[in-house]
């Protein structure tokens, strides 16, 4: 739903629950 999780994932991982890496930012449905 919310496209931006407020987290970047240049390293390849997201720490925010429910977010996945869509390089270079974390996204969620």
Swiss-Prot record:
Keywords linked to the UniProt accession: Disulfide bond, Knottin, Plant defense
InterPro entries the record matches: Cyclotide, Cyclotide_moebius_CS, Cyclotide_sf
UniProt PTM comment: This is a cyclic peptide.
Membrane spanning residue stretches: none
The keyword Disulfide bond is annotated on this UniProt entry: yes
Protein name as annotated: Varv peptide C
Domain remark from Swiss-Prot or TrEMBL: The presence of a 'disulfide through disulfide knot' structurally defines this protein as a knottin.
SUPFAM superfamilies tied to this protein: Cyclotides
Cited Pfam families: Cyclotide
Cross-link (Cyclopeptide (Gly-Asn)): 1-29
Protein task: Probably participates in a plant defense mechanism.
Organism: Viola arvensis (European field pansy)
Disulfide bond sites: 5-19, 9-21, 14-26
Family the UniProt entry places it in: Belongs to the cyclotide family. Moebius subfamily.
GO biological process: defense response
Organism taxonomic ancestry: Eukaryota, Viridiplantae, Streptophyta, Embryophyta, Tracheophyta
